[in-house]
Swiss-Prot record:
Main location group: cytoplasm
Keywords, in A-Z order: Cytoplasm, mRNA processing, mRNA splicing, mRNA transport, Nucleus, RNA-binding, Transport
Ranges of compositional bias, category Basic and acidic residues: 126-136
CDD domains listed in its UniProt record: RRM_NCBP2 (cd12240)
GO molecular function term, any single one: RNA cap binding
UniProt xrefs under InterPro entries: NCBP2, NCBP2_RRM, Nucleotide-bd_a/b_plait_sf, RBD_domain_sf, RRM_dom
UniProt-recorded name of the protein: Nuclear cap-binding protein subunit 2
Compartments, record wording: Cytoplasm, Perinuclear region; Nucleus
UniProt source species: Schizosaccharomyces pombe (strain 972 / ATCC 24843)
Length: 182
């Protein structure tokens, strides 16, 4: 049998997070603050304002920044004046595209000082540190990804012999410089 899912409902993540605290879950349902994730590192506050203001009057936008470099790290908080505007943004804007990325929006219990900083070990978001693939909109490879020579050393350190005429030393690829005359 088919079912219909409400688009302005609290996410399964928040239900799991507040499963033992129904008061906190009810407070989130009445919140006028929206967490927006999966933003490009290059998305501006003006772009977010232009998109989210279509659902109601915005009180403020707080951009998430890297804890160390203070550069955008792919999330923000949008505070509306009314709860209904926040719910409308979940219905109409969540899972839409902004800067060629599908954004995620969810109700949030409210912004507090310090929450604008990424919580990952490298200063950004935790999910970016776990990413395996190259993502140009989120700064390329994950920040904790090892350089190629370190991975080669770990993968091939057990090899102790080589065919005659070859070497076991790791070779780095020289960078091609198109401006250098050969």
């Amino acid at each position: 049998m088919a079912s219909i899912t409400r688009l302005d409902a609290v996410s399964p993540y928040l239900i799991r997070r507040f499963k033992n605290d129904l008061r906190a879950l009810d407070a989130v349902k009445q919140s006028n603050c929206v967490y927006v994730g999966n933003l490009s590192f290059y998305t501006t506050e003006e772009q977010i304002y232009a998109l989210f203001s279509k659902c109601g009057e915005i009180r403020r936008i707080i951009m998430g920044v890297d804890r160390f470099t203070k550069t955008p790290c792919g999330f923000c908080f949008v505070e509306y004046f009314e709860n209904q505007d926040a719910l409308d943004s979940l219905k109409y804007i969540s899972r839409t595209s902004l800067d060629e990325r599908i954004i995620r929006a969810d109700l949030d219990h409210g912004y507090e000082e310090g929450r604008q900083y990424g919580r990952g070990a490298s200063g950004g978001q935790v999910r970016d540190e776990m990413r395996e693939e190259f993502d140009p909109g989120r700064g390329g490879y994950a920040k904790n990804r090892q350089p190629t020579s370190s991975r080669q050393l770990a993968n091939y350190s057990g090899i102790s012999s080589a065919p005659l005429g070859s070497s076991l030393e790791l070779q780095s690829n020289p960078r091609y410089n198109r401006w250098k005359k050969n």
